[in-house]
């Protein structure tokens, strides 16, 4: 049995239910509603105090949206630098460290190239890269890419077998889902279970 079978099945359903329609809404519909749904579903809303947007007369998450639109993929900015710059911008605006949230927000804005930072996935990656420290986004991305390259062919084969999406962004998110699932299993074994990758620990 292909070890990515469950991940492809589960992410296919999740992408259809949330990622794809919400990303479309962010880019082509009510962006405020979309960013609110992302923040709520991914449980990052608590990092963005209302006193820094509604409290100063702005719409909820308006500073987040303004910051996100400053980093567009067509500007050819390095995606890692874009995530780190957005993290700094949002920390300045909301007085919180929000690396995980920034990577998630920017993934929805770009839809590709952005590697989502998540602590459950980090736990999985650390089994191969034990010296990797939390919040080291450069190191996280480097390790993530190494592991993805090893498994990309198997993921593609399983997506083909299931007649799932064959685009690279989808394969990358299947791999994210796989890392989260392994990390969650490790957390449960240690008695420290947390939410899934889509709502992972910050």
Task: Give residue spans per PLM region.
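Short hydrophobic alpha-helical segments that form membrane-spanning helices or hydrophobic packing faces
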Residues: 101-107
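An N-terminal alpha-helical hairpin/helix-loop-helix interaction module that forms a charged
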Residues: 1-95, 111-202
């Amino acid at each position: 049995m292909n070890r990515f079978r469950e991940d492809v099945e589960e992410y296919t359903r999740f992408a259809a239910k949330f990622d794809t329609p919400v990303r479309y809404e962010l880019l082509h519909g009510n962006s405020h509603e979309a960013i609110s749904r992302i923040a709520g579903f991914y449980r990052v809303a608590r990092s963005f105090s209302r006193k820094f947007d509604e409290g100063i007369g702005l719409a909820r998450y308006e500073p987040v949206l303004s910051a996100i639109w400053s980093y567009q993929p067509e500007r050819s900015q390095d995606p890692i630098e874009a995530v780190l710059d957005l993290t700094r911008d949002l920390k300045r605006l909301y007085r919180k460290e929000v690396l995980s949230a920034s990577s998630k927000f920017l993934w929805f804005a770009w839809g590709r190239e952005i590697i989502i930072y998540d602590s459950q996935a980090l736990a999985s990656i650390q089994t191969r890269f034990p010296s990797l420290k939390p919040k080291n986004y450069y190191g996280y991305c480097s390790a993530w890419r190494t592991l993805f390259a090893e498994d990309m062919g198997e993921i593609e084969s399983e997506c083909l077998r299931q007649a799932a999406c064959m685009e690279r962004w989808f394969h990358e998110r299947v791999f994210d889902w796989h890392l989260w699932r392994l990390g969650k299993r490790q957390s449960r074994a240690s008695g420290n279970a947390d939410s899934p990758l889509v709502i992972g620990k910050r």
